[in-house]
Protein backbone atom coordinates (compact mmCIF):
# COMPACT_ATOMS: atom_id res chain seq x y z
CA UNK A 1 0.00 0.00 0.00
CA UNK A 2 2.83 2.42 0.76
CA UNK A 3 4.09 2.28 -2.82
CA UNK A 4 0.64 3.14 -4.19
CA UNK A 5 0.21 5.82 -1.50
CA UNK A 6 3.32 7.58 -2.74
CA UNK A 7 2.59 6.96 -6.41
CA UNK A 8 -1.07 7.97 -6.66
CA UNK A 9 -1.90 10.17 -3.68
CA UNK A 10 -0.52 13.72 -3.68
CA UNK A 11 1.77 14.34 -0.72
CA UNK A 12 2.30 17.26 1.65
CA UNK A 13 5.99 16.62 2.29
CA UNK A 14 8.83 14.61 0.71
CA UNK A 15 8.97 12.23 3.67
CA UNK A 16 5.52 11.29 5.01
CA UNK A 17 5.36 8.89 7.95
CA UNK A 18 3.42 6.51 5.68
CA UNK A 19 2.10 4.25 8.42
CA UNK A 20 -0.25 1.72 6.84
CA UNK A 21 -3.37 1.91 8.98
CA UNK A 22 -5.54 -1.15 9.55
CA UNK A 23 -8.03 0.14 12.13
CA UNK A 24 -8.37 2.37 15.18
CA UNK A 25 -10.29 2.13 18.44
CA UNK A 26 -10.40 4.41 21.46
CA UNK A 27 -6.93 5.88 22.03
CA UNK A 28 -5.14 3.39 19.76
CA UNK A 29 -4.31 3.02 16.08
CA UNK A 30 -3.28 -0.35 14.59
CA UNK A 31 -1.12 -0.81 11.50
CA UNK A 32 -1.46 -3.55 8.89
CA UNK A 33 1.23 -5.60 10.64
CA UNK A 34 -0.91 -5.72 13.77
CA UNK A 35 1.24 -3.27 15.74
CA UNK A 36 -0.64 -1.14 18.28
CA UNK A 37 0.10 2.57 18.74
CA UNK A 38 -1.11 4.81 21.55
CA UNK A 39 -2.32 8.01 19.92
CA UNK A 40 -1.14 11.25 21.55
CA UNK A 41 -2.09 13.34 18.49
CA UNK A 42 -5.78 12.58 17.80
CA UNK A 43 -5.56 13.32 14.11
CA UNK A 44 -3.98 16.70 14.98
CA UNK A 45 -6.61 17.62 17.59
CA UNK A 46 -9.51 16.43 15.42
CA UNK A 47 -10.52 13.13 17.04
CA UNK A 48 -11.73 14.73 20.25
CA UNK A 49 -13.55 11.58 21.41
CA UNK A 50 -10.92 9.15 20.21
CA UNK A 51 -11.43 6.62 17.44
CA UNK A 52 -14.73 4.85 16.75
CA UNK A 53 -16.57 6.53 19.60
CA UNK A 54 -19.86 4.60 19.94
CA UNK A 55 -22.07 7.68 20.28
CA UNK A 56 -20.60 9.31 17.19
CA UNK A 57 -20.62 6.09 15.18
CA UNK A 58 -24.25 5.41 16.06
CA UNK A 59 -25.30 8.93 15.10
CA UNK A 60 -23.60 8.54 11.72
CA UNK A 61 -25.22 5.14 11.09
CA UNK A 62 -28.66 6.36 12.12
CA UNK A 63 -28.45 9.35 9.80
CA UNK A 64 -27.16 7.27 6.88
CA UNK A 65 -30.28 5.14 7.18
CA UNK A 66 -32.45 8.26 6.74
CA UNK A 67 -30.75 10.38 4.07
CA UNK A 68 -27.38 11.79 3.11
CA UNK A 69 -26.79 14.82 0.87
CA UNK A 70 -30.04 16.19 -0.55
CA UNK A 71 -29.44 19.89 -1.36
CA UNK A 72 -26.85 22.65 -1.24
CA UNK A 73 -26.36 24.36 2.11
CA UNK A 74 -29.03 26.72 3.34
CA UNK A 75 -32.03 25.67 1.23
CA UNK A 76 -33.62 22.75 3.09
CA UNK A 77 -34.20 22.43 6.82
CA UNK A 78 -32.32 19.29 7.87
CA UNK A 79 -32.64 18.16 11.47
CA UNK A 80 -29.00 17.29 12.28
CA UNK A 81 -27.69 20.68 11.16
CA UNK A 82 -30.53 22.63 12.76
CA UNK A 83 -30.19 20.81 16.08
CA UNK A 84 -26.43 21.20 16.13
CA UNK A 85 -26.57 24.94 15.44
CA UNK A 86 -29.30 25.31 18.07
CA UNK A 87 -27.27 23.47 20.70
CA UNK A 88 -24.13 25.40 19.78
CA UNK A 89 -26.05 28.66 20.22
CA UNK A 90 -27.03 27.52 23.71
CA UNK A 91 -23.36 27.28 24.69
CA UNK A 92 -22.15 30.40 22.87
CA UNK A 93 -22.17 33.72 24.76
CA UNK A 94 -24.56 36.45 23.70
CA UNK A 95 -24.90 37.69 21.01
CA UNK A 96 -23.20 34.84 19.07
CA UNK A 97 -26.24 32.82 18.04
CA UNK A 98 -26.15 32.07 14.31
CA UNK A 99 -23.78 29.56 12.71
CA UNK A 100 -22.72 28.87 9.14
CA UNK A 101 -21.57 25.27 8.58
CA UNK A 102 -18.75 24.49 6.16
CA UNK A 103 -16.40 21.58 5.49
CA UNK A 104 -13.11 22.52 7.15
CA UNK A 105 -11.37 25.02 9.37
CA UNK A 106 -9.81 26.94 6.50
CA UNK A 107 -13.25 27.36 4.90
CA UNK A 108 -14.48 28.77 8.20
CA UNK A 109 -11.63 31.28 8.12
CA UNK A 110 -12.47 32.29 4.56
CA UNK A 111 -16.12 32.80 5.51
CA UNK A 112 -15.22 34.87 8.56
CA UNK A 113 -12.94 37.13 6.53
CA UNK A 114 -15.68 37.70 3.97
CA UNK A 115 -18.14 38.41 6.75
CA UNK A 116 -15.83 41.02 8.30
CA UNK A 117 -15.56 42.88 5.01
CA UNK A 118 -19.30 42.70 4.53
CA UNK A 119 -20.03 44.02 8.04
CA UNK A 120 -17.48 46.84 8.11
CA UNK A 121 -17.05 47.81 4.47
CA UNK A 122 -13.31 47.87 5.15
CA UNK A 123 -10.51 45.88 3.53
CA UNK A 124 -7.65 45.59 6.01
CA UNK A 125 -7.00 42.49 8.08
CA UNK A 126 -4.57 42.13 10.95
CA UNK A 127 -3.13 38.83 12.12
CA UNK A 128 -0.20 37.73 14.27
CA UNK A 129 3.30 36.62 13.44
CA UNK A 130 3.48 32.82 13.45
CA UNK A 131 -0.32 32.56 13.32
CA UNK A 132 -1.97 29.72 11.42
CA UNK A 133 -5.60 29.86 10.27
CA UNK A 134 -5.60 27.48 7.30
CA UNK A 135 -3.94 27.03 3.94
CA UNK A 136 -6.28 28.34 1.24
CA UNK A 137 -5.56 31.71 -0.37
CA UNK A 138 -7.42 33.92 2.09
CA UNK A 139 -6.40 32.03 5.21
CA UNK A 140 -2.84 31.80 3.93
CA UNK A 141 -2.86 35.58 3.55
CA UNK A 142 -3.39 35.91 7.31
CA UNK A 143 -0.84 33.19 8.09
CA UNK A 144 2.07 34.75 9.95
CA UNK A 145 4.90 32.63 8.58
CA UNK A 146 6.46 33.98 5.38
CA UNK A 147 8.43 30.85 4.53
CA UNK A 148 5.19 28.96 3.85
CA UNK A 149 3.64 31.82 1.84
CA UNK A 150 6.31 33.16 -0.50
CA UNK A 151 5.86 30.55 -3.23
CA UNK A 152 2.15 31.42 -3.55
CA UNK A 153 2.30 35.22 -3.66
CA UNK A 154 0.62 37.51 -4.53
CA UNK A 155 -1.94 36.86 -1.81
CA UNK A 156 -4.60 39.18 -0.35
CA UNK A 157 -3.39 42.78 -0.16
CA UNK A 158 -3.85 45.00 2.89
CA UNK A 159 -2.87 42.46 5.55
CA UNK A 160 -0.69 43.55 8.47
CA UNK A 161 0.84 41.58 11.33
CA UNK A 162 1.41 42.16 15.02
CA UNK A 163 3.23 40.18 17.67
CA UNK A 164 1.05 38.00 19.90
CA UNK A 165 0.98 39.38 23.46
CA UNK A 166 2.60 42.69 22.43
CA UNK A 167 0.31 45.40 23.80
CA UNK A 168 2.05 48.20 21.87
CA UNK A 169 1.15 46.54 18.58
CA UNK A 170 -2.57 46.77 19.38
CA UNK A 171 -2.48 50.38 18.16
CA UNK A 172 -2.08 49.01 14.61
CA UNK A 173 -5.81 48.23 14.73
CA UNK A 174 -7.38 51.38 13.25
CA UNK A 175 -10.52 52.68 11.58
CA UNK A 176 -9.22 51.08 8.36
CA UNK A 177 -9.24 47.60 9.91
CA UNK A 178 -12.06 45.23 9.01
CA UNK A 179 -10.96 42.61 11.53
CA UNK A 180 -8.13 41.21 13.54
CA UNK A 181 -7.96 37.43 13.58
CA UNK A 182 -6.35 35.68 16.55
CA UNK A 183 -6.07 32.15 17.86
CA UNK A 184 -7.23 31.94 21.47
CA UNK A 185 -4.03 29.93 21.99
CA UNK A 186 -1.44 30.16 19.23
CA UNK A 187 -1.08 26.68 17.78
CA UNK A 188 1.63 26.43 15.13
CA UNK A 189 3.75 28.96 17.04
CA UNK A 190 4.17 26.59 19.97
CA UNK A 191 0.93 26.59 22.01
CA UNK A 192 1.41 30.11 23.34
CA UNK A 193 -1.29 31.46 25.65
CA UNK A 194 -2.40 35.09 25.75
CA UNK A 195 -0.96 37.00 28.70
CA UNK A 196 -1.83 40.07 30.78
CA UNK A 197 -5.33 40.43 29.37
CA UNK A 198 -4.07 40.63 25.79
CA UNK A 199 -7.28 39.36 24.18
CA UNK A 200 -9.41 41.70 26.31
CA UNK A 201 -7.27 44.68 25.33
CA UNK A 202 -7.53 43.73 21.66
CA UNK A 203 -11.33 43.56 21.96
CA UNK A 204 -11.43 46.98 23.64
CA UNK A 205 -9.40 48.45 20.80
CA UNK A 206 -11.68 46.82 18.23
CA UNK A 207 -14.71 48.42 19.89
CA UNK A 208 -12.98 51.82 19.86
CA UNK A 209 -12.33 51.75 16.10
CA UNK A 210 -15.25 49.62 14.87
CA UNK A 211 -13.20 46.59 13.83
CA UNK A 212 -14.27 42.98 14.42
CA UNK A 213 -12.42 40.49 16.59
CA UNK A 214 -12.32 37.04 14.98
CA UNK A 215 -11.21 34.30 17.37
CA UNK A 216 -9.91 31.08 15.85
CA UNK A 217 -11.08 28.10 17.91
CA UNK A 218 -10.29 25.51 15.26
CA UNK A 219 -7.76 23.76 17.49
CA UNK A 220 -8.53 24.95 21.06
CA UNK A 221 -12.29 24.61 20.72
CA UNK A 222 -14.66 21.87 21.88
CA UNK A 223 -13.22 21.19 25.29
CA UNK A 224 -9.52 20.87 24.63
CA UNK A 225 -8.43 23.69 26.98
CA UNK A 226 -10.68 23.01 29.97
CA UNK A 227 -13.50 25.18 28.63
CA UNK A 228 -15.78 24.47 25.70
CA UNK A 229 -14.00 27.30 23.86
CA UNK A 230 -10.54 28.63 24.51
CA UNK A 231 -11.63 32.27 24.61
CA UNK A 232 -13.70 31.52 27.71
CA UNK A 233 -10.43 31.21 29.64
CA UNK A 234 -9.52 34.83 28.91
CA UNK A 235 -12.59 36.94 29.69
CA UNK A 236 -13.38 38.02 26.14
CA UNK A 237 -16.35 37.66 23.79
CA UNK A 238 -15.32 37.77 20.12
CA UNK A 239 -17.42 39.12 17.27
CA UNK A 240 -16.87 36.00 15.17
CA UNK A 241 -15.77 32.51 16.23
CA UNK A 242 -14.29 30.07 13.73
CA UNK A 243 -14.29 26.32 14.44
CA UNK A 244 -13.26 22.98 12.99
CA UNK A 245 -11.14 19.95 13.96
CA UNK A 246 -12.62 18.56 17.21
CA UNK A 247 -16.19 19.69 16.56
CA UNK A 248 -16.90 16.68 14.35
CA UNK A 249 -15.36 13.92 16.45
CA UNK A 250 -13.01 13.09 13.59
CA UNK A 251 -15.29 14.00 10.68
CA UNK A 252 -14.45 16.83 8.22
CA UNK A 253 -16.24 20.00 9.26
CA UNK A 254 -15.88 23.70 10.00
CA UNK A 255 -18.12 26.55 11.09
CA UNK A 256 -18.20 30.24 11.91
CA UNK A 257 -20.58 31.88 14.35
CA UNK A 258 -21.55 35.53 14.90
CA UNK A 259 -24.60 37.52 15.88
CA UNK A 260 -27.65 37.18 13.64
CA UNK A 261 -27.51 40.73 12.29
CA UNK A 262 -24.03 40.06 10.93
CA UNK A 263 -24.69 36.60 9.54
CA UNK A 264 -27.84 37.75 7.77
CA UNK A 265 -25.70 40.06 5.62
CA UNK A 266 -24.33 37.03 3.76
CA UNK A 267 -27.79 36.17 2.39
CA UNK A 268 -28.64 39.49 0.75
CA UNK A 269 -27.03 42.21 -1.40
CA UNK A 270 -25.81 40.05 -2.98
CA UNK A 271 -27.93 36.98 -2.47
CA UNK A 272 -25.85 33.83 -2.11
CA UNK A 273 -23.02 35.96 -0.73
CA UNK A 274 -21.45 32.83 0.72
CA UNK A 275 -22.37 29.36 -0.52
CA UNK A 276 -21.21 25.77 -0.19
CA UNK A 277 -22.51 22.51 -1.63
CA UNK A 278 -21.66 20.15 1.20
CA UNK A 279 -21.63 22.46 4.23
CA UNK A 280 -24.03 21.20 6.90
CA UNK A 281 -23.99 17.70 5.39
CA UNK A 282 -26.52 15.74 7.47
CA UNK A 283 -24.20 12.84 8.27
CA UNK A 284 -21.41 15.17 9.35
CA UNK A 285 -23.84 17.36 11.31
CA UNK A 286 -25.13 14.27 13.11
CA UNK A 287 -21.56 13.48 14.14
CA UNK A 288 -21.10 17.07 15.33
CA UNK A 289 -24.29 16.95 17.37
CA UNK A 290 -23.29 13.66 19.01
CA UNK A 291 -19.81 15.03 19.72
CA UNK A 292 -21.08 18.25 21.28
CA UNK A 293 -23.58 16.35 23.41
CA UNK A 294 -20.93 13.93 24.63
CA UNK A 295 -18.51 16.72 25.51
CA UNK A 296 -21.10 18.80 27.35
CA UNK A 297 -23.07 16.02 29.07
CA UNK A 298 -20.04 14.31 30.63
CA UNK A 299 -17.10 15.45 32.73
CA UNK A 300 -14.68 15.44 29.78
CA UNK A 301 -14.09 19.20 29.92
CA UNK A 302 -13.31 19.36 33.63
CA UNK A 303 -11.19 16.21 33.39
CA UNK A 304 -9.07 17.89 30.72
CA UNK A 305 -7.39 20.03 33.38
CA UNK A 306 -6.87 17.02 35.66
CA UNK A 307 -5.17 15.22 32.78
CA UNK A 308 -3.04 18.27 32.00
CA UNK A 309 -1.78 18.22 35.59
CA UNK A 310 -0.85 14.55 35.25
CA UNK A 311 1.07 15.22 32.01
CA UNK A 312 2.98 18.04 33.69
CA UNK A 313 3.82 15.86 36.69
CA UNK A 314 5.10 13.04 34.50
CA UNK A 315 6.94 14.93 31.75
CA UNK A 316 9.97 15.90 33.80
CA UNK A 317 13.36 15.26 32.21
CA UNK A 318 16.58 17.24 31.60
CA UNK A 319 15.85 17.29 27.85
CA UNK A 320 12.37 18.79 28.39
CA UNK A 321 12.81 22.50 29.00
CA UNK A 322 9.14 23.41 29.37
CA UNK A 323 5.63 22.07 28.85
CA UNK A 324 3.49 24.70 27.12
CA UNK A 325 -0.22 24.97 26.53
CA UNK A 326 -3.42 24.35 28.40
CA UNK A 327 -5.63 21.34 29.00
CA UNK A 328 -4.90 18.69 26.39
CA UNK A 329 -3.34 21.17 23.97
CA UNK A 330 0.24 20.66 25.14
CA UNK A 331 3.74 20.88 23.73
CA UNK A 332 6.88 19.48 25.31
CA UNK A 333 9.65 21.94 24.46
CA UNK A 334 13.18 20.69 23.82
CA UNK A 335 16.40 22.49 22.84
CA UNK A 336 16.58 21.72 19.12
CA UNK A 337 14.43 20.50 16.21
CA UNK A 338 16.81 17.55 15.91
CA UNK A 339 15.81 16.37 19.39
CA UNK A 340 12.14 16.77 18.44
CA UNK A 341 12.60 14.63 15.35
CA UNK A 342 14.47 11.90 17.20
CA UNK A 343 11.89 11.73 19.99
CA UNK A 344 8.98 11.49 17.54
CA UNK A 345 10.59 8.70 15.52
CA UNK A 346 11.83 6.79 18.57
CA UNK A 347 8.41 6.94 20.18
CA UNK A 348 6.69 5.74 17.02
CA UNK A 349 9.03 2.74 16.98
CA UNK A 350 8.03 2.11 20.60
CA UNK A 351 4.30 2.34 19.86
CA UNK A 352 3.46 5.98 20.66
CA UNK A 353 2.27 8.54 18.13
CA UNK A 354 3.60 12.08 18.57
CA UNK A 355 3.85 14.86 15.99
CA UNK A 356 5.30 18.27 15.18
CA UNK A 357 3.95 21.81 15.35
CA UNK A 358 3.97 23.88 12.16
CA UNK A 359 6.31 26.74 12.98
CA UNK A 360 8.13 25.71 16.17
CA UNK A 361 10.63 22.96 15.52
CA UNK A 362 11.51 22.56 19.20
CA UNK A 363 7.96 21.54 20.14
CA UNK A 364 6.65 17.99 20.49
CA UNK A 365 2.89 17.96 19.99
CA UNK A 366 0.81 16.26 22.69
CA UNK A 367 -2.88 16.56 21.80
CA UNK A 368 -4.50 13.23 22.69
CA UNK A 369 -8.24 12.54 22.59
CA UNK A 370 -10.17 14.14 25.44
CA UNK A 371 -11.25 10.60 26.33
CA UNK A 372 -7.72 9.39 27.07
CA UNK A 373 -7.45 7.63 30.42
CA UNK A 374 -4.96 8.32 33.20
CA UNK A 375 -3.43 4.88 32.64
CA UNK A 376 -2.94 5.65 28.95
CA UNK A 377 -1.33 8.98 29.84
CA UNK A 378 1.08 7.15 32.15
CA UNK A 379 1.78 4.55 29.45
CA UNK A 380 2.58 7.19 26.83
CA UNK A 381 4.65 9.40 29.10
CA UNK A 382 6.72 6.37 30.14
CA UNK A 383 7.53 5.80 26.47
CA UNK A 384 8.53 9.45 26.01
CA UNK A 385 10.79 9.33 29.07
CA UNK A 386 12.33 6.05 27.91
CA UNK A 387 13.17 7.61 24.53
CA UNK A 388 14.59 10.73 26.19
CA UNK A 389 16.71 8.64 28.55
CA UNK A 390 18.22 6.74 25.63
CA UNK A 391 19.08 10.02 23.94
CA UNK A 392 20.36 11.65 27.13
CA UNK A 393 22.79 8.88 27.95
CA UNK A 394 23.96 8.70 24.33
CA UNK A 395 25.17 12.32 24.51
What annotation goes with each model-predicted range?
Residues 1-395:
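Conserved N-terminal phosphate-binding loop of PLP-dependent enzymes in the Aspartate aminotransferase
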